Amino acid sequence: MTPYLAAEDLSMFGRDPWWLVVVKAVFCFAFLMITVLFSIVWERKVVAWMQLRIGPNRHGPWGMLQSLADGIKLMLKEDLIVKRADKVVYVLAPIVAAIPAFMAIAVIPFGPADNEISIFGHRTAMQLTDLPIAMLYILAVASVGIYGIVLAGWSSGSTYPLLGGLRSCAQMISYEIAMGAAFASVFLYSGSMSTSTIVEQQHDRWYIVLLPVSFVIYIVTMVGETNRAPFDMPESEGDLVGGFNTEYSSIKFAMFMLAEYVNMVTVSAVSTTLFLGGWRAPWPISTFWEGANHGWWPMLWFVVKVQLLLFFFIWLRGTLPRVRYDQLMKLGWKVLIPVSVVWLMLVATVRTLRNENYDFADIALYVGGGVLVLLLLSFVADMFREKSKEAAAPAEEPAAFDPMAGGFPVPPLPGQTLPPVPRRRPRRDRELIVSGGPDTASDGPANGKEASDG
């Protein structure tokens, strides 16, 4: 007889009672929502300071309730549905984009597995659940979120959202390859895909020190994955009006914005877990304070690291301009993927040497990391060198402006002139020709005037 699912061994998901699992799930949801509300206000404040402005200062103390006011405003706005839209897919797209953004936090550890805290008299770990393949789960969930953006662009029945959805699909596919290679190097060095085990393996040195190239690659790819500046091509208002969410309003638009900021928090939490020691206290504190990694303190260190990475997102938005789409694809396919593959091979080689008890493995890893960082900088320098050569090249004569090149007339842009319009030759003076021909004598006077009677 086939056993039921309830009879299977589900101990890998934890041994907490169902009500405690619900409490921890609600805590994870509340953590994401509070962090998002704070991050929106923090972003507007930081960008305002960069631009010598005040920023939000009306709702709540120091404008801290501005995000809540914006959310209520969006919920009370009129919800419009485009007539040409595929209504079922149009409504489901924001949900498909928002739900996967919340799911990845389930396997992120907020504290050590052996440091159980007491919740209503029950001892439990500071993590919703831990899986042996937790990082593969995060990759799978992150890949599902792209469907919401693509479906939103396709179902809107408009050109601009469709182009934004296609851009987002191509961008995320391009950058997930390099992200997967960065993850693989961490798996090779830690020997596990479990998030709690990866944090435990960083007890002496964080992976940002051992795997610096993987950290740089992941930082670049996480900005591309979240469609944030300077890689926010799917929603560039300069050429796509509003991008994939142009035709959305009210609560549906708010769900897309919520998904974007929740993704920022999620990728920052993943980066903290993989490269920054997770919940572990920073190096100076952990050396003289033994209790820094016990109790509720690990959650404080984790939140501080996540907030620093969120500030990095904000700093990028306030300082860097949006790159062109061809530059974005060139960076992903010609720089990040080759560097990540070479670095992964080097990490695998060093890991093999360490298993054979070679002493120079760490030295080779550091040297290889430095070499790849130099290669990455050389790639970026080549890009700027080509741009400077193009700027220094003598300007060619611009092609003549053709107002009908696109099939319909368009006005000239500044600096363009309309070509001269061909005119007919001026008409010659007409000669008076009588009906009988030029050789026929006319009955009238020679000057063409009629004779009078007197």
UniProtKB/Swiss-Prot annotation:
Alphabetically list the UniProt keywords.
Cell membrane, Membrane, NAD, Quinone, Translocase, Transmembrane, Transmembrane helix, Ubiquinone
Q: Which GO terms describe its cellular component?
A: plasma membrane
EC numbers: 7.1.1.-
For this protein, what reaction is catalysed? Answer: a quinone + NADH + 5 H(+)(in) = a quinol + NAD(+) + 4 H(+)(out)
Q: Where in the cell is it found?
A: Cell membrane
Bias regions of kind Pro residues — which residues? 409-421
Residues passing through the membrane, by range: 18-38, 88-108, 131-151, 172-192, 206-226, 256-276, 296-316, 328-348, 360-380
Location of region: Disordered: 395-454
Q: Does the keyword NAD apply?
A: yes
Give the bilayer topology.
Answer: Multi-pass membrane protein
Q: Name one GO molecular function term.
A: NADH dehydrogenase activity
* PROSITE patterns registered for this protein in UniProt: COMPLEX1_ND1_1, COMPLEX1_ND1_2
Where primarily located?
membrane
Annotated GO biological process: aerobic respiration
Q: Which EC class does it fall in? A: translocase
Q: What does this protein do?
A: NDH-1 shuttles electrons from NADH, via FMN and iron-sulfur (Fe-S) centers, to quinones in the respiratory chain. The immediate electron acceptor for the enzyme in this species is believed to be ubiquinone. Couples the redox reaction to proton translocation (for every two electrons transferred, four hydrogen ions are translocated across the cytoplasmic membrane), and thus conserves the redox energy in a proton gradient. This subunit may bind ubiquinone.
HAMAP family found in the cross-reference section? NDH1_NuoH
* PANTHER family with a match to the protein in the record: NADH DEHYDROGENASE SUBUNIT 1, NADH-UBIQUINONE OXIDOREDUCTASE CHAIN 1
Q: What family does this chain come from, according to its entry?
A: Belongs to the complex I subunit 1 family.
Q: How does it assemble?
A: NDH-1 is composed of 14 different subunits. Subunits NuoA, H, J, K, L, M, N constitute the membrane sector of the complex.
This protein's name? NADH-quinone oxidoreductase subunit H
